[in-house]
């Protein structure tokens, strides 16, 4: 299914963008010629419209969605300041709500929902570019943050992508592209354990160019073009409840572009 084209200016087209699927909306967050811009695709109307801006516009965020709510944590503002600000987006009302700030400012973190709580994991907290090893847990009921040591699977240094994380059946997994390993987070021992290999095609540029997501009870990895001779993307999946990692190719498509953004809707 091809979506309609977005009616944006050149500034937005060439800016860094974030994408997030929440409810029946797809949000694309970037910068247009006049400042921060958000465009919203509605699955119900098959059309794009301009969305309301964040209360504190930011980029390079950690984000995740659950049902009709998405949470966006940290990031950087237009001046490059690393933020601890957090906001939620409600797809039913199309509005933003400011939430309590994180314990630490962080950019290029990864966000997930697990066991009904939101987690911001890894990222960079200051201009020295040293990656954070901790994560933070946000309880939606108490509206409080808790720091969790050593929750990042590693990586996330200068020039690298945020940690590649996925939640399936309320278990947390990570793709270690440098070692080509699949890891699982032990909630009991609070540590990462290698459980298998990634698909051999899962090559990346310091983590960029690969999408790693949870979709219901399965883990999905989307691999972009490897070189000029192989101009296509492939989608692999694995269902943890069915045994050790055995990746199945579930789709592929010819493409001439690098994979920049990925969002999964309806899992």
Region locations from a protein language model:
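Kelch-like beta-propeller repeat domains
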Residues: 1-267
